[in-house]
Amino acid sequence: MKPLLVVFVFLFLWDPVLAGINSLSSEMHKKCYKNGICRLECYESEMLVAYCMFQLECCVKGNPAP
């Protein structure tokens, strides 16, 4: 009976955790500084120009002027 209670508590608390992750997915691929895109990590052909929320990187294609 006790393991069943633990499973129910875990499932009840898991929903707010997933809600927090969804805010991260809404920030990914969002437009940012100098027409860049927020990503987890910039590609080799892109340059990091700023940081977005949740430590995402704002990436711009090519090598833009400073």
From Swiss-Prot:
The gene is DEFB134. InterPro entries: Beta_defensin_dom. Disulfide bonds join 32-58, 38-52, 42-59. The lineage of its organism: Eukaryota, Metazoa, Chordata, Craniata, Vertebrata. Belongs to the beta-defensin family. It comes from Homo sapiens. Residues 1-19 form the signal peptide. The keyword Signal applies. Its main location: secreted. The keyword ATP-binding does not apply. It is found in: Secreted. Keywords: Antibiotic, Antimicrobial, Defensin, Disulfide bond, Secreted, Signal. This is Beta-defensin 134.
